[in-house]
Design a protein with these regions (language model features):
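Extended, histidine- and acidic-residue-enriched regions that form the cofactor-binding/catalytic faces
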Residues: 1-231, 235-398
Length: 398
């Protein structure tokens, strides 16, 4: 009996959370380390260890929250598996040779998309069984559905890959907690778009087209179920331009909904005022793994911060109409190589961060999102009133 306990304890130690590492730590992993992206949670890790032939270490990526059959939002499988395939290919591009998707028994990605059979592992899972629960529940109709999207990407030498996901999840939950009758936060999506993926190790990339197709399909499904107010909330700058396209597509396809997004959190009138009030770095000190993001993490997950490794990176190639700060300045939009401006992956002055700043900025970010939710409700209600009254061309359509 003692030996079996030792064996179980040893097995539990072989698993590590990929997104809690820094990018240099990922770069140092042996390239034959198995990396597993699970669809949902609740799998048997002892069984998984056996399925992988009991390797010395296994990296568990953040669980993908929904999209497969039985998850509560069932997307067309070609759209869903394109997203998954792009994520797995990000790991392969980094040189990893044992990359897997862990999925419920009964899914057959080969039947609808060319996902190699060697790329997936199946186990019994709750989402394989009836009755299935819709996500969000139909009882939540009439609320603004908050859709937080983070990312899994490098954040310099001192922060984990999960920074964007931790921050936006906390903001979305905070907003929903303050107005439970007016909004509902969806499970956070930990994977977005990084067009600079190849510059530093460990950065994932869902791909712009797959990202757009996935989220437009989500809106299609939720609208068909009677939801009509949506707010895409991004914790990652690389998602922004694609989210603009998504809300435009959604508005064109569904004329009686109100689907919105915004630039990064803590960047509207409330957030910007709080940044200006509490920051100690100059312009250029807030961009990525910076004073702002590091402060958030010191407040929310200090156990994942390695402040002894902080390197301030403020040598951005700046001109009057193109420079880096949290609220980007200038009229030019561009996408030069990330490593033109950063040696470590960071943009900004992480050494200025404190947990107290993180607390204050989180409060401001939540207040800002609560304000946005109220505006989304007002926009939808006033527009519906006009439509129902036959305003302009609406009078010819009714």
């Amino acid at each position: 009996m003692k030996n079996s306990y030792v064996e179980l304890a040893t097995r539990s130690k072989i698993f590590f959370n990929y997104d809690e590492l820094t990018w240099p730590e990922v770069a140092d992993l042996p390239r034959d380390t198995p990396l597993v992206l699970p669809l949902g949670s609740g799998y048997d890790l002892d069984l998984l260890a056996d399925q992988l032939s009991n390797p010395p270490r296994v990296g568990l990526l953040p669980a993908f929250p929904f999209g497969w059959r039985g998850s509560g939002i069932d997307l067309p499988e070609p759209i869903f598996f394109q997203y998954i395939t792009n994520l797995l290919n990000s790991l392969r591009d980094d040189g990893f040779t044992r990359v897997y998707c862990l999925m419920p028994q009964g899914l057959d990605p080969q039947s609808t998309y060319n996902l190699q059979s060697s790329s997936f592992i199946t186990q019994p899972h709750g989402s394989s069984h009836s009755p299935k629960t819709f996500l969000p529940p139909d009882s939540e109709r009439g609320k603004v559905i908050l859709i937080p999207i983070g990312h899994t990407e490098q954040h310099g030498f001192h922060l984990p890959l999960s920074v964007d996901t931790i921050i936006i999840d906390s903001i979305a939950k905070g907003a929903a907690d303050q107005m439970p009758t007016r909004s509902l936060a969806m499970p956070v999506m930990p994977y977005g778009v990084s067009t600079h993926r190849s510059s530093f190790a460990a950065t994932m990339n869902a791909g712009g087209r797959a990202f757009e197709d996935f989220w437009v399909a989500v809106i299609d499904i939720l609208v068909a179920r009677g939801f009509d107010r949506f707010y895409f909330m991004s914790g990652h700058g690389g998602n922004t331009s694609f989210l603009v396209n998504i809300v435009k597509y959604a508005g064109e396809r569904h004329r009686r909904i109100f689907c919105a997004t915004a630039f990064l959190h803590t960047s509207g009138s409330i957030g910007a005022a709080a940044l200006e009030k509490y920051r100690t770095s100059k312009i250029g000190g807030m961009g990525h793994a910076c004073e702002l993001e590091t402060s958030y993490l010191l407040h929310l997950r200090p156990d994942l911060c390695h402040m002894e490794r902080v390197v301030d990176e403020i040598d951005f190639v700046a001109t009057p109409d193109y420079y880096m700060d949290w609220i980007e300045g200038g009229s030019l939009v561009a996408n030069p190589p990330w490593d033109d401006d950063s040696k470590t992956g960071a943009y900004g002055a992480g050494s200025h961060a404190t947990a107290e700043k993180g607390r204050l900025w989180l409060e401001a970010a939540i207040e800002e999102k609560v304000n946005h939710v109220e505006q989304i409700h007002e926009q939808h209600e006033r527009r519906e009133k006009r439509r129902n009254e036959g305003y302009g061309l609406w009078g010819k359509f009714t």
